[in-house]
Amino acid sequence: MDTKKAIVLGADNNYRDKLETTIKSICYHNRDLKFYIFNEDIPKEWFYLMEKRLEKLNCEILNIEIDAEKVKHFSTPDEHIKYMTYFRYFIAEFVKEDRALYLDCDMVVHGNIDPLFQKDFEENYIIAVPDGWYKNIFNAGMMMVNVHKWKTDNICQNLLELTAEKHQEVYGDQGVLNLLFENKWKKVSPHYNFMVGLDTLGYWAQKPEWFLNSWDENYKPAIIHFEGKDKPWNDSLKTRYRELWWFYNGLDWQTILLEKDSKPTSFSEIATVNLFHTAIFTDTQELEHIEYLVEKLPNVHFHIFAHSYFGPRVQVLNRFLNVSLYPNYTPYQSQEMLSKLDFYLDINHNREIDNIISKVHDLSKPIFAFENTSHDTNNRSQILQKNQTKW
């Protein structure tokens, strides 16, 4: 018997590229799937294209049109969260299988999800991961749903009624789901809903557990969740695993069909990337000859860090493809950068930031500076001449 694993995703037509990125990531690592796409306005032509692509993976896709009028009047806790988030209430109304994996479309799957489908519900309504901020509740971005129990207990209607009563008092549908399923959900490892995206907030709120496992470069979560407003497809560079999202987004379907050992595994394999990396840590817009250096060194990527927002003279550098700006950076971002640093540019005026010169010397990486910008009190940096033309 050909049994496929049920996956439920919800989106509108404006979010279709994010939806497809999530599907690509799932199919990169998994086969034999049945996708239920909850929506109200995605064109049928997209489904025709997806059917053709997915059939080669022994997968299928269903267009599930939801009557949005049933949920449009419910409030959402933030402007980036739309009423489509309530579509997950209808899972048991349409899914034929006894269990289904629900995923938000700001997630990518980075491994095999078979173990999730093998977990015992133990009479619970869902299997989920505790929220990154409040451990006594679950994050609703990933839910393994006990569809059979939802149907038996008329969960869809119960959720709609409870939402009508409580939607302005709790955190959207996640708040309602936690009310209804209090003490009726089973915990699973954050490996299956590894939450990023609120990194700056986590740092300033002094919650080091938010970065749990991020320091271990060998840790590879199976599902990554880009929570909050700092999505990887936005211009902000605050989000961990940003390149991973763009890797799955950039994959073509022919590549996904390849055998495992033949597939690319990183963003650098499918995109043009710079050969070398340098960094500047600053608290001022005064960066000596920065634009000249950026233009003369096209194979070098310039990573500029500050504890505040950037002024216009630095912000304008964002037009260069080999420049990345990190306002209000976190320790995780700086450590990640230093791990791939080739050399450091000590070209900011004013004071040294975060004892960066000593940190770079400890890494045995070269430091280049101008005579009027050097912060190296031990005179180990290489001093550049202002009229120097070879770099």
Regions found by a protein language model. Give the residues of each.
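Conserved catalytic-core segment of nucleotide-activated headgroup transferases in glycan assembly
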Residues: 37, 271-316
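Acidic donor-binding loop of glycosyltransferase active sites
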Residues: 339-352
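Short aromatic/hydrophobic "clamp" motif used to bind/position activated sugar donors
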Residues: 100
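Active-site-proximal specificity loops/subdomain of glycosyltransferases
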Residues: 45-48, 52-93
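Conserved donor-nucleotide/metal-binding helix-loop-beta segment in metal-dependent transferases, i.e.
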Residues: 107-136
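A glycosyltransferase accessory/donor-loop signature
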Residues: 1-14, 18-21, 147-275
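Conserved active-site histidine-acidic residue motif and adjacent donor-binding/catalytic loop
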Residues: 307-310, 323-337, 353
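Short hydrophobic beta-strand element within catalytic cores of glycosyltransferases
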Residues: 366-370
